[in-house]
Amino acid sequence: MRTITHWIDGKPYEGTPIGRFAVENPGTGEVEAELLQASDADLDHAVEVARRAQKEWAKVSLAKRTEIMFRMRQLVLDHQDEMAKMIVAEHGKNYSDAIGEIQRGRETLDFATAINVALKGEFSSGISTGVDIHTLRQPVGVVAGICPFNFPAMVPMWMHPIAVATGNAFILKPASATPSAALLTAELYKEAGLPDGVFNVVSGNRTMVSKVLEHPGIDAISFVGSTPVAHIVQNTGVTHGKRVQALGGANNHAIVMPDSDLDFAAQHISAAAFGAAGERCMALPVVVAVGGCGPDLARRVKAHAEKIKVGYGMDEGVEMGPVIDAKSKEFITGLIDDAEAKGAEVVLDGRPLVIPGHEKGHFLGPTIVDNVSLESLLYSEEVFGPVLAIVHADTYEEAIKQVNSSPFGNGAAIFTNDGGVARRFELDVEAGMVGINVPIPTPVAYYSFGGWKESLLGDTHIHGPEGVRFYTRAKAVTTRWPSEKTYAATMSFQREE
């Protein structure tokens, strides 16, 4: 059985594990490796190494840092096939989706190659007689990134390129179910020339995560995961004096207006709902059909969804893989059962799906449920599976009220050909990322990613300009260089003329 270790100080590290986690292939149901679970001593060692390395790394010139980021970007491109196969084996998504994930993550490396521009400060001359002021942005220190299973490459890449490029050391805690991409990333950073100890990978259970949140040697925490855990991360981290960004769950809605091109909407809704088996925080699990367009929309979405080839991620032509594990499959089917019991109509049922040769895999087919009650769990819970719930509204006003009633506010979209309605929507909707005829409005890397309400705790979004601000601290420097003229010191706040 293959053993997956940590990565500390530029090399694999076994330490003194407190246990082992069985890493399963969701497409086969077979255990493929065992992941070492870190002890407190292992985490302490990683933090000690990171703190020592960060002090020297922060002194490295921006030119040298960007050079390393350029090399890292190319290495990720060169090794994307290897990384994608790791993702297929541990997460289950199909190969093309895994490649797409890596490419989207690499966009943040693109942004990090221009960190010298992002770190440009401000300068004001002559704020008083002979006095100038300028600002600096300096690294916060040691950053921990706690990441989910669904994007083993992309979500960490939302964090570590900017954190590292701005002069921090980084400790990545990957999801135990999908650790291998993190280890490959560490190897590539070393090959790119990053000094040992600046990027580390430590795996562990909930006890270790609690230790991360409380550790005095960790200065900042980036988290992406469920909302309940995001609350724990935010509250515990802040209580222990850390800078925290905690991105939580989602239950994204799209409004479909009757004036929209329904086939265009259906095609894009199908891709947004069922891509990556719905296991993404920007998936589209809920559609609000307005003005009686629901039955026609459901029929059109079904026509697209029925064409999706479900199977093992490396098999030719497969467009959708399994969900992550048996527990997740059971949870999702339970939500469908609950909606059906409360009067919903299952238009397309993926529950009975079995893939020949992969009978132990955790497969669900695309599922469409119409006339979903607002009281059903399928409507209110974060599904994280290949299920689309369709609810109905008579007017735009009723539809936007339904969208905004959700405690989540990650992403939201509208399909319409009416510019006035679209403009109202972008102002009315309570979400951090908004799409107009775009069902998955994920920003590119030079914009920031983040939701509202229960989808983001705190106020700092991830990557882009807000990512730079999160991983750095501002410093204002006021200077005066005395000349032959002497200025008297003053105790007042009055400016000298």
Where are the regions a protein language model picked out?
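N-terminal Rossmann-like NAD(P)+-binding subdomain of aldehyde/semialdehyde dehydrogenases
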Residues: 1-131, 324
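Structural signal for hydrophobic packing residues in well-ordered secondary-structure cores
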Residues: 54, 58, 73-80, 84, ...
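Conserved C-terminal structural/oligomerization subdomain of aldehyde/semialdehyde dehydrogenase
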Residues: 25-34, 218, 255, 309, ...
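Residue-level signal for inorganic ion chemistry
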Residues: 29, 65, 87, 109, ...
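ALDH superfamily catalytic-core signature
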Residues: 228-373, 436, 485-487, 492-497
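Short, well-ordered beta-strand elements within core beta-sheets of diverse protein domains
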Residues: 32-38, 52-59, 145, 254-257, ...
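Residues at or immediately preceding the N-termini of alpha-helices
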Residues: 26, 40-43, 62, 95, ...
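Rossmann-like NAD(P) dinucleotide-binding subdomain of oxidoreductase/dehydrogenase enzymes
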Residues: 121-264, 393, 458
